Structure formats: structure tokens, C-alpha cells
Amino acid sequence: MADQTISNVLNQPQWRCLESKIEKSTLHYGRFIISPLWKGQANTIGLALRRTLLSEVEGTCITSVKIKNAIHEYSSLSGVQESVHDILINLKKIILSSSFSGIFEGFLSVVGPKTVLASDLNLPSFIKIVNPDQYIATVNKPINFNLQIYIQKGKGYSLKNPISIKQGFFLVDPVFIPIRSVNYSIHSFEDEKATKEFLIVEVWTNGSIEPKEAIKEASYNLVNLFTPLVSQEYQQLKNQLFKEDEKNKELNFIETNSNAISDNENSYNLYNQIFLDQLELSSRAYNSLKKNNINTISDLLKYSYEDLLKIKNFGKKSADQVIEQLKKRFKIQL
């Protein structure tokens, strides 16, 4: 029993960090593995995770700025080397990190002559500047140089911000994407006569979030996306079956869910939500079953071994494969 429990745990997909390093303050790298996976699952997870990392992970940016004495975006400021447009571009390059959502205010007030850097900004204590050496402007005369900025957390691209319509404020055109790049690769291996896969994911961030945390956030977003699609009844059934499996009991849908299913319902209804592709049959066997309107495990359980042999183009080899997969995956003896 203990050996079987250990085997069940080892067969559950698990994440592990293979490598983590800081190449520079604005470039953090992480390499991860998830294994074991059934054939085809690695590509499904890799594609969904990559797209979610690049579009759904939140970032913190300066969204708008008010510059004293600035008339319009392409105007020049007396005593300042850069135009307003150049200052906005430099502010956009500042990388911020914050665990709080909302709109926050920051200030900058210096007296020239001075080279103005991101480290000269006065921000709330919970907002960290990842690249404090980021250049903003050069004040080449003994004048006051003042900025008022707004900071916000968001996802993806923001081309419009209500704050920017206030008089004297300029939109910084922020990009709320802390992920610089994502790569994934799929590798196969043999396990107990079955071909399985493992997924390698590489993540580069701008330093405002660690790759490991980005993976977690993207995974949570995917879970939250699919959760509403799962009915309450099916979720309860899944939870009950998981508990039974952890106790190393036979995977018997009827017995483990007797309290959730009325007496007049037959056992096949429990398998209506499990489709044939979960058995990973050969193309010939799968197509033959589909042609005979056998789409779910529930449909399949209506057939005996002898009945399967009577199906056109469904030979003994295919029937034996069905028997083996039902027993292996669902502990069902047809």
C-alpha cells in the first residue's frame, strides 16, 4: 500500500526550479521543469502559460506626469537639456515594483545644475525603483526642476489614462509587461512502457518580479479563467475522487459518490464527462469507436469485450487495448 501511495505521488505533475540567476538588475532569469506529463499535455501547458505570462502578469509603471512650465509635449524647458518629449520617454524606461494596486503619487524636486536620475524621485515606501540609475534629464542652470507623477499597476498596454486629461499632465504611454521573454521546450521519455513528457520553461523578467513569482501569478490566472467553466457538481465529484485516491482506495465512481448521486441514477452517468481521448487509444481504435457513436467512457461501458469485437474494423488488438487502458486509468474491468 505504501509503495502504491508513493507511486501515485510521483506520477502527479510537479514544478521544480532548475536555475535562477540575476544577469543584471533589469534582467532576471529562471528555468523550470514540470513532469511527468502525458503526451500532448506539455504543449498545452507551455502554450497557455507563455501567452498568459506575456499578457496577464501585472506590472507597475509611471502613467502620467506634470512638468512645471511645460506647455505641450514637444516644448522645451528653460535650463533643461531635454525636451518634454524626451523626458517622457526617459520616465517610461523607469522600472517599478509594487505589491499594491491602485493609483499612487510621486514627486521630484531638484535644483540645478544636476543630472536627474530615477533615484531622485520621491515615491511611497512600498514602491521600489528597480533601475535607480535610469537617466531622466540634465538641468544645466541653477533653476528648480519639478515633476508630479502618477503610478499605477496594470496589465499589457495602456493607451489611455483618465489622469492624463487633467490640465498640465502628459501621458507616459505605459507598458505594464514585466516579462521580457518566455521560451518553452518539450522532451519525451519512457516510463513503465508509456511515453511521457516533461516541459522546460524559461522566463526572463525586467527585475520587477522574480520569474518564479511570475510563473505562480500566470498559473493562478489560468486557474481562475477555467474555474467558472467547471460545474459545482463536477467539482465536488472531482474532489471526492481525489480524496479517495489519496487513501489508495479503488477508483470506483459509484461507491465514492453515493451520497451525491440518487439511487435511481446508474453508474454510467458518472463517466459522461470523461471522453475517449483520455484513454489515449490508437487512431484506428479511436476512430472506429467514434464512428459507432461511442464518445465517452459511459458509452464504452455499455459494450462487453465480445461486443467490441463485433464492431467493424475493430479487431482483437484494439479491443485488448481498450481493456488495458480502462483497467490502467480507471480500475475498470470490462
Swiss-Prot record:
One of its GO terms (molecular function) is DNA binding. GO terms for cellular component: chloroplast; DNA-directed RNA polymerase complex; mitochondrion. It catalyses: RNA(n) + a ribonucleoside 5'-triphosphate = RNA(n+1) + diphosphate. One of its GO terms (biological process) is DNA-templated transcription. It holds the Pfam family RNA_pol_L. It is an enzyme of class 2 (transferase). Residues 263-334 are annotated as: Alpha C-terminal domain (alpha-CTD). The keyword Iron-sulfur does not apply. InterPro entries: DNA-dir_RNA_pol_insert (IPR011262), DNA-dir_RNA_pol_RpoA/D/Rpb3 (IPR011263), DNA-dir_RpoA (IPR011773), RBP11-like (IPR036603), RNAP_asu_C (IPR011260), RNApol_insert_sf (IPR036643). Its EC number is 2.7.7.6. It is found in: Plastid, Chloroplast. The keyword Chloroplast applies. Residues 1-233 are annotated as: Alpha N-terminal domain (alpha-NTD). Keywords: Chloroplast, DNA-directed RNA polymerase, Nucleotidyltransferase, Plastid, Transcription, Transferase. The N-terminal domain is essential for RNAP assembly and basal transcription, whereas the C-terminal domain is involved in interaction with transcriptional regulators and with upstream promoter elements. In plastids the minimal PEP RNA polymerase catalytic core is composed of four subunits: alpha, beta, beta', and beta''. When a (nuclear-encoded) sigma factor is associated with the core the holoenzyme is formed, which can initiate transcription. Belongs to the RNA polymerase alpha chain family. DNA-dependent RNA polymerase catalyzes the transcription of DNA into RNA using the four ribonucleoside triphosphates as substrates. This is DNA-directed RNA polymerase subunit alpha. It comes from Chaetosphaeridium globosum.
